[in-house]
């Protein structure tokens, strides 16, 4: 069973409220761009691909309801600008906004308002199918690359945060690799970190693993290095919110220390991400803007205080893993590339932000 984080049919969008998982399964209606922005900002929906898809689909829903009749191009532009500001570290929303805006402006030269409305909605709806197809390619490429180093054995994977069906339109990126290994009968075990402070691993990845029958074990973030030493980890596979030209990768905070530990233990470290998560306009990770989240997300859990009152808090949502630590490769829908190969492989295929 593949979990369904996004339910869409023309004019109607529902998202699985991931803040309530695994205790409750609740779908929230998204009726407008404002609803989409709030769902992204509050992390009801998260994961770089899903952020872009939900953001753009929220625009499609509002367009289908007749919004933007006076100046549709301006309405699309203003809506995309607003959506892009919700979570700036993830590149997918910004890239989708730029490409959709360029498409809208070009189409507006030849079509009336209602024809343009249909064209824009059609472009957005195609994102869903493209994302699932790209994720399946990522899963297959990643699984084959990992298995090429262990041709006869089952493999044990360590992952961080949540990168499965709940973070995409379906199938997943890093967890898509795990899914492909499982479908091939070659997954011995998945170790998933709890991923503090938002617990995406404990709440979401563990939820997906149980629902889909993966052999999986949950560990705390601080157990990862020990697991690498004691549990015969074959590879570490994580997702990405932004991969820049030299291969430096922004992902959920805690990824950097996993890469350091993997390097120490001689374990291949992979990043799995669609090419839409790659930003060739930035030369290195130093240029990535890192989102900082509210202190309350660290000092309390489900509204219950767990830290001493008055303590100062630093709560970055992401960290940057230097490309030198990505030893396995960067898994995309186009293939698996070393960081040094990425820019040449993607140049011409992407529109730089």
Curated annotation (Swiss-Prot):
Top-rank taxon: Eukaryota
Pathway the protein acts in: Amino-acid biosynthesis; L-methionine biosynthesis via salvage pathway; L-methionine from S-methyl-5-thio-alpha-D-ribose 1-phosphate: step 1/6
Enzyme class: isomerase
Taxonomic source organism: Danio rerio (Zebrafish)
Subcellular locations according to the entry: Cytoplasm; Nucleus
Keyword Isomerase appears in the UniProt entry: yes
InterPro entries noted in UniProt: IF-2B-related, IF-M1Pi, IF_2B-like_C, Initiation_fac_2B_a/b/d, M1Pi_N, NagB/RpiA_transferase-like
Keywords: Amino-acid biosynthesis, Cytoplasm, Isomerase, Methionine biosynthesis, Nucleus
PANTHER family hit by this protein: METHYLTHIORIBOSE-1-PHOSPHATE ISOMERASE
Protein family: Belongs to the eIF-2B alpha/beta/delta subunits family. MtnA subfamily.
Catalytic activity from the UniProt record: 5-(methylsulfanyl)-alpha-D-ribose 1-phosphate = 5-(methylsulfanyl)-D-ribulose 1-phosphate
Entry annotation: catalytic residues: 241
GO terms, molecular function: S-methyl-5-thioribose-1-phosphate isomerase activity
Annotated GO biological process: L-methionine salvage from methylthioadenosine
Descriptive protein name: Methylthioribose-1-phosphate isomerase
Annotated positions for site Transition state stabilizer: 161
């Amino acid at each position: 069973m593949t979990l369904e984080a996004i339910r869409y049919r023309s004019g109607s969008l529902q998202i699985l409220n991931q803040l309530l998982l695994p205790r409750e399964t609740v779908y929230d209606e998204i009726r407008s761009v404002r609803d989409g922005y709030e769902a992204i900002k509050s992390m009801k929906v998260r994961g770089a691909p899903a952020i872009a898809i939900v953001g753009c689909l929220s625009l499609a829903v509002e367009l289908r309801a007749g919004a933007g009749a006076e100046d549709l191009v301006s309405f699309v532009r203003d809506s995309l600008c607003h959506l892009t500001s919700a979570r700036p570290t993830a590149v997918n929303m910004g890239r989708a906004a730029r490409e959709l805006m360029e498409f809208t402006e070009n189409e507006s030269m030849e079509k009336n308002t209602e024809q343009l409305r249909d064209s824009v909605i059609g472009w957005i709806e195609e994102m869903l199918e493209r994302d699932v197809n790209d994720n399946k390619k990522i899963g297959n490429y990643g699984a084959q690359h990992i298995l090429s180093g262990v041709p006869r054995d089952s493999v044990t994977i360590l992952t961080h945060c949540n990168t499965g069906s709940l973070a995409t339109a379906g199938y997943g990126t890093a967890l898509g690799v795990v899914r492909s290994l499982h479908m091939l009968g070659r997954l011995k075990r998945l170790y998933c970190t709890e991923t503090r402070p938002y617990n995406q691993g404990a709440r979401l990845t563990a939820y997906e693993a149980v629902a889909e029958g993966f052999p999986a074990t949950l560990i705390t973030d601080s157990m990862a290095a020990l697991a690498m030493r004691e549990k015969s980890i074959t590879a570490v596979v994580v997702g990405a919110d932004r991969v820049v030209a030299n291969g430096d990768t922004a992902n959920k905070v805690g990824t950097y220390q996993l890469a350091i530990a993997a390097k120490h233990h001689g374990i291949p470290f992979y990043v799995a991400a669609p090419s839409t998560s790659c930003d060739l306009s930035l030369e290195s990770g130093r240029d990535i803007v890192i989102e900082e989240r509210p202190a309350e997300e660290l000092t309390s859990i489900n509204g219950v205080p767990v830290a001493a009152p008055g303590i100062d808090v630093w709560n970055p949502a992401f960290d940057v893993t230097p490309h030198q630590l990505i030893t396995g490769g960067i898994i995309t829908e186009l293939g698996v590339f070393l960081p040094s190969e990425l820019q040449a492989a993607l140049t011409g295929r992407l529109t730089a932000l």
